[in-house]
Structures are given as structure tokens and as C-alpha cells.
Amino acid sequence: MLGLSATGVLVGGLWAWIAPPIHAVVAITRAGERVHEYLGSESQNFFIAPFMLLGLLSVLAVVASALMWQWREHRGPQMVAGLSIGLTTAAAIAAGVGALVVRLRYGALDFDTVPLSRGDHALTYVTQAPPVFFARRPLQIALTLMWPAGIASLVYALLAAGTARDDLGGYPAVDPSSNARTEALETPQAPVS
């Protein structure tokens, strides 16, 4: 779980580095009202940035579950539970680190307090930090944080379904065909005449 927490820091830092900011303009209308508008398709970054975080967390979930599957002697439900807890923690850390880094990089933006230029056209171009979550509702935040655990559980279940042995290949390996051979050797044979 500590390893997954450390990767959460890396994922949060990577997301903060590649997440696109939102560019906007703040202006005063002729009626004296302060307005703001996003430039071009910049408003799409409100969706793109959180989706990029989900993509990075999904990659982490697939890689982590595949690596954990290699740890043969501990395969089973306890590993899935630990993987789920670790990935949920990693997602929370990634979201926290990402939000902190973009906040430090772009600062907090309040459209009502942006200083405007003087002159005929009172306007200012601003850059807004990308959001970490799609919305600020608790359910959407919880689903975002639990997303990698669900992906990892799905990958782990597919790997378990593809295993031919009931013990998921754990150690010590028990080969049913070798048991049949030893039983056949121990069974007394009737003399052949």
C-alpha cells in the first residue's frame, strides 16, 4: 500500500504537469457589468482535465493489478482488498497532490476581483487552474476515488477467470495429475497370470 501511495504522488504530479489550463477573458460591458467568457473551446478543459486524471489512474490500476498477480503465494480475496484500499488511497493522494500543484502553479482565480486594464476596452486575459474532479458533489468525488479500485478488481477477476487451477496457481503448487500417479503407484496390483 505504501508503494501505491508513492505512485499516487507521481500520478498527481504528472497530471498537474500535463493537465490543460482554462483560458478566459474578463471584461466590463457598456452597462458596467463585469462578465467573463472562456476563449474558444477552452471550456472543454473542465471535462478533459478530470478525464485525464481518470485515465492515469486507470493505467495505474491495470499495471498494479497485473504486478500483484505475479505475487503467486498471496493470490486471493485479501490481495484484492489490499489492492482496492491501496488504489483508493493512491487516487486520493493523486487528486490532492494534483490540486495542490495546479493551485500553486496557476493560483486561485476569482472573476469578481480580477484587476482590469484601463482605457476604452477594459478587459484582462486570465488563466484558470484545471479541475481535478468533474464536480464538487461528494458522490462524484467518491466515484472518482474508487474508480481505480473497480478497474483493478475487474482486471484481477479476468486474470483469475483465466487461471485453470482452483488455487489460482498459488504455492505450494498442487498438480492433480501427479496425485493420480502416486495413488496409482500405491494401489496394489493383482498378479497377472
Curated annotation (Swiss-Prot):
Residues annotated as transmembrane: 8-28, 46-66, 82-102, 141-161
Record-linked Pfam families: DUF2567 (PF10821)
Subcellular location per the Swiss-Prot or TrEMBL entry: Cell membrane
Cellular compartments per GO CC: extracellular region; plasma membrane
Keyword Glycoprotein set for record: no
Keywords: Cell membrane, Membrane, Transmembrane, Transmembrane helix
Bilayer topology term: Multi-pass membrane protein
Signal peptide positions (record): none
Domain of life where this protein originates: Bacteria
Primary localization class, coarse: membrane
Family: To M.leprae ML1222.
The protein's name: Uncharacterized protein Rv1591
Upper classification of the organism: Bacteria, Bacillati, Actinomycetota, Actinomycetes, Mycobacteriales
